[in-house]
Design a protein with these regions (language model features):
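Charged, low-complexity, helix/coiled-coil-prone segments
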Residues: 1-12, 62-72, 96-106
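Post-cleavage N-terminal segment of exported redox proteins
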Residues: 1-49, 163-168, 189-203
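Electron-transfer interface patches adjacent to heme c in soluble/periplasmic c-type cytochromes
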Residues: 14-24, 81-185
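A generic secondary-structure signal for well-formed alpha-helical elements
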Residues: 31-38, 63-67, 72, 76, ...
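Sequence context of c-type cytochrome heme-c attachment sites
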Residues: 32-46, 51-54, 70, 86-99
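Electrostatic cytochrome c docking/interface patches
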Residues: 37-61, 73-80, 105, 175-178, ...
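The canonical Cys-X-X-Cys-His
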Residues: 56, 62-71, 121, 188-192
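Surface-exposed patches in mature extracellular/periplasmic domains of secreted proteins
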Residues: 68, 134-139, 199-203
Length: 203
């Protein structure tokens, strides 16, 4: 019979047993994930981003907003009380790549959709200190003058369709029209206003 002392004295045996434990742990934790519907299917009510929201998401990524804002409310009481219902995997099925983030210089944004008006976001993006005096977020006034980029929107939507986002041909065909005469600020606000709205929240 193997004793603890025997295992510690035999390095080869100890390595084999460590690898065996890691392998079993990996199988138990990882293998079931693809078969769990809650991890792979969208939550009820989740819609793909509209062309305007998708363009706003690109602006969000380009400007590095993920460096200071996360988009994942963790299942802790303090977070739920501050931000709203905790995030679930089915809300991110159409996010390629997801924007969970790992740093919060600013607040989490996953439940910001519908919390403030479009005008509030517009004022905040131009100069955050107009609304939150202690904010260290930079302003983004140029977004109000930059036209929303419609050049490659159809290509983006087709690429997303290849990875499972259910865009229809008609949506792709009408995408440029939705971006006509819209600014990057319009697009970013549209994106922020849809974040976390697929699941109804109890406030």
């Amino acid at each position: 019979m193997l004793t603890h002392d025997t295992i510690e004295r035999n390095q080869g045996l100890m390595i084999v047993l460590i690898l065996l434990v890691i392998a079993i742990g990996g199988l138990v934790e990882i293998v079931p994930l693809p078969f769990m519907k809650s991890m792979t299917e969208p939550v009820a009510g989740l819609e793909p981003y509209t062309p305007l929201q998708l363009t706003g998401r690109d602006v969000y990524i380009r400007e590095g907003c993920y460096g200071c804002h996360s988009q994942m409310v963790r299942p802790f009481r303090a977070e739920v009380e501050r931000y709203g219902r905790y995030s679930v995997a089915g809300e991110f099925v159409y996010d390629h790549p997801f924007q969970w983030g790992s740093k919060r210089t600013g607040p989490d944004l996953h439940r910001v959709g519908g919390r403030y008006s479009d005008e509030w976001h517009r004022l905040h993006l131009v100069n955050p200190r107009n609304l939150v005096p202690e904010s260290n977020m930079p302003g983004y006034p140029w977004l109000a003058k930059a036209a929303a980029n419609a050049e490659d929107i159809e290509t983006k939507m087709r690429a997303l369709r290849l990875v499972g986002v259910p865009y229809k041909d008609q949506q792709i065909a009408e995408a440029r029209g939705e971006l006509k005469d819209r600014t990057e600020m319009d697009a970013l606000i549209a994106y922020l206003q849809v974040l976390g709205t697929a699941i109804k929240q109890k406030q």
